[in-house]
Amino acid sequence: MKSIILSCFVISAAASQSYLPTEQIDVQSSLLSDPNHVAGKTVDYMIAGGGLTGLTIAAKLTENPNINVLVIENGFYESSEGEIIEDLNDYGDIFGTTVDHAYEIVSQAINNRTENIRSGNGLGGSTLTNGGSWTRPHKAQIDSWEKVFGNKDWNWDNLFPYMQKAEIARPPNDVEIAAGHFYNSSCHGTNGTVHAGPRNNGEPYSPIIETLMDSAKERGVPTQLDFHCGVPRGISMIPNALHEDQVRSDAAREWLLPNYKRPNLQVLTGQFVGKVLINQTATSGAIPGYKAVGVNFGTNKNVNSNVYAKHEVLLASGSAVSPRILEYSGIGLKSVLDAAGIQQIVDLPVGLNMQDQTTTTVGSRTKPSGNGQGQAIYFATFNETFGDYAPPAHELLNTKLHQWATETVARGGFHNVTALEIQYENYRDWLVNEEVAYTELFLDTSGKINFDLWDLIPFTRGSVHIQGNDPYLRRFSYDPKFFMNELDLLGQAAGSKLAREISNTGGMQTYFDGETTPGSNLAYNADLDQWVDYVKQNFRANWHAVGTCSMMAEELGGVVDSAARVYGVEGLRVVDGSIPPTQVSSHVMTVFYAMSLKISDAILADFHAKSSKH
């Protein structure tokens, strides 16, 4: 196998702050699209996926000119149906285009419906398709990754500096502060890579946000806080991942464009990584060893090639795809692999522990006096969400954990009752003792009072598994098993009920001009049971799935260790959103960027340790 120094071309890194759409489209012509340029060759690190984590890690590794990296991405730099939607206010316009994977889930038992999971397909991944919300989780949640799940050094104090390192924060101006923003400079980074600041289209801000905060204060809810300091709670406006000119700050713009002029970085687009190439190494007793040596990639079973990795293969294809690559490679549950006709080499609970959230909408019209731009988040605690229904909800937490774990394992969402009960006990501790945010109510005031809301801490566990042995047919079962846990359904219903109440109480009555969703479809005095019935038929996925290649101790159900290395296979890591062992009370971009930087340091430490031995 021949080693190659990989190269490509880029416009000046100095111009990375402000690209015109035409300049962005020209980037694609500078990337590789012919697989023959890399087929049969060897690089130091092969990254499967050019999304948020893949591009971040590629940029960090290639800061060392002696490290050669190849990124293989299924998508391209821009959509074949038009350039990326740069205005975050219009992000939904890209759904259904070639930049949206639109994974179809299996029919859900709760309502016999299927839907598409929105996920970015292109360089930048879901940073091309999301709404850009920029928040961070609760300290206790990240601390549990070490304390509960055995991931050494994965705690708030260690991850927080990486969150700051990723960020170029733009403080709010006086007008934005008056509208409801708050900024604590000690919680932000200013010398990072991803731009984050207030969304501001130049129009006046709606008075609704300030009024909502005033009403919340009367109920003892904290307001106008910085949700980046480790305790997201209450109501405030938030920054978004965007430049000062309001252009999207996506992973391709910030991590690829300034760097792919490097002679040691190459990006191949329009190709799908099907499986990892794994060799058996020396046997230790009765247990054989295995090492990842490359990947097979292509477009179909008749048109595919191998490329080899001298050091490591890094899977960065996301929570829906990375577990499938592992399974096609012989890593996973025997029952799944046998059914697919694949020889198992390593037994790990790949594809289990999927944790996605569910979304409902409560929307109303505003009187003209309430018009204006603005978005805010209410991070509501468990008690705030349930209100008068909190006592029976607590009773469920105190009496049902073992039953829920048993039922979840029986449904195929996890594989070990005892280990899952530990997860559930951790979630109960968050909700009861730490008072982490349980529900996010996302308010948009652009001529309306619109709450999109979701249960942040689902107890339901789903799965994703391959169906067949040909990765290029992309046949798989994606099953979040929404609302198979009773508390999740009750929580989504209670959050929806809360959104209706706060839309039209106190000072909000000044601007409220009639509800549109649910509107007449649900009686205004509906009780929680009626809201449950409504939610069953009117929710959607939140598209934030994590956990399908969980990072935790192997005996707890881990697929990767605290350095993101796959158990039982040398030279193979999973480095994307499939590895967080828990959900968090946050939008996940900030966590994924910090993860990427921390894992990059681990990879580089191993590289330097190996180099020093030679």
Curated annotation (Swiss-Prot):
Secretion signal, residue range per the UniProt entry: 1-15
UniProt cross-references to PROSITE patterns, sorted A to Z: GMC_OXRED_2
A single cellular component GO annotation: cytoplasm
Keywords: Cell wall, Cytoplasm, Disulfide bond, Extracellular matrix, FAD, Flavoprotein, Glycoprotein, Oxidoreductase, Secreted, Signal
Disulphide bridges, residue numbers: 187-229
Chief site of localization: secreted
Protein location: Secreted; Secreted, Cell wall; Cytoplasm; Secreted, Extracellular space, Extracellular matrix
GO BP, one annotated term: secondary metabolite biosynthetic process
Active site, UniProt feature: 544 (proton acceptor)
Record-given protein name: Glucose oxidase 1
